């Protein structure tokens, strides 16, 4: 049970009904259905993902420049002496300023510590989920192509895409 209703948790092996557990909402419950949750809590931001109970520092595989990978690992070690949780450095770190990555890392580690240290009991929301705007800013890091010339819809196939949406699949 959550403050917003019943939840559905996969992988419940070893749990008994009524056991309390820290979970993270992973989606929206359809009308009449339970809210999907997982017990593996992640703290995502633009540059890092903090993974409690999954130690290690990992750099996104899409960052192929070995020098940049080493620089990113140095940012983590220079920012945090003893890393208490696992950390994934996201692909957006490749072109980001090191200071921005360090600030983001400290913010996410602080949030993780705050949530994980809560010793309350009963259903409780420990933090707000990200807004759609923040989700977009976090996950869409490539610069947008803005077309303002006449004929832009035709040049980029917008009308064809709209027509495709009108037909049944």
Question: What residue spans do the PLM features occupy?
Answer:
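DE-rich acidic low-complexity regions and acidic surface loops
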Residues: 1-169
